[in-house]
């Protein structure tokens, strides 16, 4: 199946791609949200092929996200098509908030030939409900994980997140955005400056697991 038939968008890397990243959106905004497009373009400019997509509920303009099995199935379909489109030998998956959580679900399900997971703002719990943790699957993840978390994230601060991270047997890297919120926005800093920081962190992490590449 091709990317276009799935409503996915591919961002070609500058130069030969060193890796592929399939990036899923958060619960409230689709792949055309400025965060998603800026991050995708930033990775591509640094030598990583990127594919974004909309989950079924977003394509159908429904407000309530689909159940996890539906989201996971859609994610897997896009990963399969993205691998054919890219040709990169290393495949990473990830996403913003809910999309990142779904990526960890696929990592826990042992998706074939997965190199790692990149999460921008893991939604550990709903805001104001720290007892409703979304962590049961984390201990089953067997691939490296990078979590980029705002220091003031209402869905889970880095301090709250650390006990959950310790249940993951694979290597986990936690990058904290000082004074950042769940959207990784920081008062007093330009949005593009913060995004450049987190993209640089993520690309360096991908390079470390992929070897050198062109950008």
Give residue spans per PLM region.
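Acidic catalytic loop of the alpha/beta-hydrolase fold
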Residues: 151-155, 182-183
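Short beta-strand/loop motif that positions the catalytic acidic residue
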Residues: 141-142, 147-149, 153
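Catalytic active-site module of serine/aspartate enzymes centered on a nucleophile-bearing elbow/loop
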Residues: 180, 188-215
């Amino acid at each position: 199946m091709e990317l276009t038939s799935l409503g996915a968008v591919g961002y070609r890397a500058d130069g030969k791609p060193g890796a592929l990243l399939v990036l899923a959106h958060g619960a409230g905004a689709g792949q055309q949200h400025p965060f998603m497009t800026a991050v995708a373009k930033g990775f591509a400019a640094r030598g990583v092929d990127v594919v974004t997509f909309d989950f079924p509920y977003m394509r159908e303009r429904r407000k309530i996200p689909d159940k996890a099995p539906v989201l996971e199935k859609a994610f897997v379909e896009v990963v399969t098509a993205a691998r054919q489109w890219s040709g990169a030998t290393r495949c990473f998956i990830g996403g913003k908030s809910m999309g990142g959580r779904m990526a960890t679900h696929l990592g826990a399900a042992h998706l074939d030939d997965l190199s790692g997971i990149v999460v921008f703002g893991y939604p550990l719990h709903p805001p104001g409900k720290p007892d409703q943790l979304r962590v049961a699957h984390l201990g089953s993840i067997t691939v490296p994980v990078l979590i980029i978390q705002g220091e003031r994230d209402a869905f889970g601060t880095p301090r709250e997140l650390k006990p959950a991270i310790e249940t993951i047997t694979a290597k986990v890297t936690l990058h904290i955005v000082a004074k950042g919120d769940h959207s990784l926005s920081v008062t007093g800093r330009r949005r593009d400056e913060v995004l450049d920081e987190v993209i640089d962190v993520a690309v360096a992490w991908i390079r470390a697991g992929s070897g050198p590449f062109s950008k």
